[in-house]
């Protein structure tokens, strides 16, 4: 139960931070910073699993990735237009969402959930997301839904493709391949 609760909380925290990040910074910043998760997974598992030790070339790759991320954010004029502190807050939230995703992945790899069927892990994450995020939507005044055909289609797509199929594939990959 503890590993399931851990991944549920981390999953909910990731999506909460992601949703908040988009309120303060651009979607492009959010996506780039969210997808730092594999870097943090490689770093985290390097210290926890002997089979995931990073080689010198992999360390070089991580350094290049970090330098690339920093380089893409340097010298952007739109930061001043949007308000630097607001954008930086959103960027921090997006980076924290990436770290939460990485911690979720690391928790999956290090716990008994690594041996569980992917549907069980998916259940923990989606149930946890619902239990923690549903009340937060009301507390933050973000619970109003404007039902349109596009909204319904998007909900169906994200439920079936993004939440089910892609996460099932992700869990299968985690069980069958090293993160590094």
Short names for language-model regions:
Residues 2-6, 53-67, 115-125:
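Cytoplasmic-side transmembrane-helix entry/capping segments in multi-pass membrane proteins
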């Amino acid at each position: 139960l503890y590993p399931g609760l851990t991944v549920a909380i981390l999953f909910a925290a990731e999506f909460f931070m992601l949703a908040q990040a988009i309120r303060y910074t651009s979607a492009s910043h959010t996506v780039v910073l969210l997808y730092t998760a594999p870097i943090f997974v490689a770093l985290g598992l390097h210290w926890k699993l002997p089979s995931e030790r990073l080689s010198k070339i992999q360390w070089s790759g991580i350094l290049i990735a970090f330098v690339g991320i920093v380089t893409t954010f340097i010298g952007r004029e739109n930061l001043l237009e949007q308000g630097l502190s607001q954008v930086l807050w959103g960027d921090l939230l997006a980076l924290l969402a990436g770290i939460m995703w990485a911690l979720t992945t690391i928790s999956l790899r290090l716990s008994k959930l690594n041996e569980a069927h992917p549907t069980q892990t998916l259940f923990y994450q989606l149930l946890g997301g619902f239990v923690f995020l549903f009340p937060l939507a009301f507390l933050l005044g973000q619970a109003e839904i404007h039902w349109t055909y596009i909204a319904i289609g998007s909900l169906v797509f994200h439920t079936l493709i993004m939440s089910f199929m892609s996460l099932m594939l992700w869990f299968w990959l985690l069980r069958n391949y090293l993160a590094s």
